[in-house]
């Protein structure tokens, strides 16, 4: 196919998987996969982590974000592994390990599209949210993709669908470390000596110091998650 109409119910009788789109940009793919979810399960959706900058949009998206969208389908990687750093290869190994652990839920669980609300009930349109629940309702994966960072933004909430109301769930997120180079010359707000952005010194420091990501760790009932939700830790807001 050179464009749309790739998915055909008749063809799915003969082949178990269809390539969703030649556009592998994670922001675009989130919308594409969101649309496919109205008619097709994740188990037939080919979804890949590709190079950054993306070949279709030239957008730079972090590896962990590209994985977060691609894992909501049949995960694959279309990267030249010989071009990746040791850190990126280690991250991919962890991603594949995580995907294998949760593959049954991600591919065969019930897929829910979630509406987002910020504080005081304000509707949040700057994020794509999904949660995928195992057939027995005991396990689930939540995915949130922030489209853009806004300054002074209020906390986001995790409000689910499909969880067992009377079950106790342990809610936690992936433990991630972030490259300090993503903060640009903000490093000079804490560095005792001037550090030029993208310099050799900047690169050397990135191998020694990494930023901790947000931490989520909650014990809560399915009823609370489905009906009220829980506030998430604040990310970078400027």
Segments the model singles out, each with a brief description of its role:
Residues 1-83:
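Glycan-recognition surfaces
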Residues 148-238:
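C-terminal beta-sandwich/jelly-roll accessory domains of carbohydrate-active enzymes
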Residues 70, 142, 171:
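Conserved, mostly hydrophobic/aromatic
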Residues 1-3, 79-83, 143-146, 162, ...:
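Active-site proximal loops enriched in glycine and acidic residues that flank catalytic Cys/His/Asp
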Residues 64-117:
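Catalytic cores of secreted or luminal carbohydrate-active enzymes
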Residues 119-165:
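Carbohydrate-binding surface patches
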Residues 106, 110, 116-125, 154-156, ...:
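Alpha-helical protein-protein interaction modules
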Residues 5-10, 120-126, 181-182:
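Short, solvent-exposed polar/charged micro-motifs at secondary-structure junctions
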């Amino acid at each position: 196919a050179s464009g749309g109409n790739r998915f055909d119910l008749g063809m799915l009788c003969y082949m178990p998987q269809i390539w969703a789109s030649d556009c592998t940009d994670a922001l675009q793919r989130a919308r594409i996969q969101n649309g496919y979810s109205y008619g097709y399960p994740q188990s037939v959706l080919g979804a890949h982590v590709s190079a950054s900058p993306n070949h279709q949009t030239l957008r730079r998206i972090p590896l962990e974000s590209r994985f977060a969208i691609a894992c909501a389908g049949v995960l694959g990687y279309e990267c030249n592994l010989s071009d990746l750093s040791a850190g990126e290869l280690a991250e991919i190994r962890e991603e594949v390990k995580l995907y294998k652990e949760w593959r049954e839920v991600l591919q065969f669980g019930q897929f829910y599209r979630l509406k987002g609300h910020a504080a005081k009930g304000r509707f949040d349109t700057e994020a794509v949210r999904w949660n995928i629940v195992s057939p027995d309702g005991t396990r689930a994966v939540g995915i949130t993709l922030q489209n853009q960072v806004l300054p002074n933004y209020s906390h986001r909430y995790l409000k689910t669908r499909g969880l067992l109301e009377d079950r106790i769930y342990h809610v936690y997120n992936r433990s991630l470390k972030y490259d300090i180079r993503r903060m640009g010359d903000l490093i000079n707000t804490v560095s005792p000596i001037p550090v030029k952005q993208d310099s050799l010194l900047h690169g050397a420091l990135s191998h020694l110091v990494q930023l901790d990501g947000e931490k989520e760790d909650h014990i809560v009932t399915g009823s609370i998650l489905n009906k009220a939700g829980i506030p998430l830790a604040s990310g970078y807001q400027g």
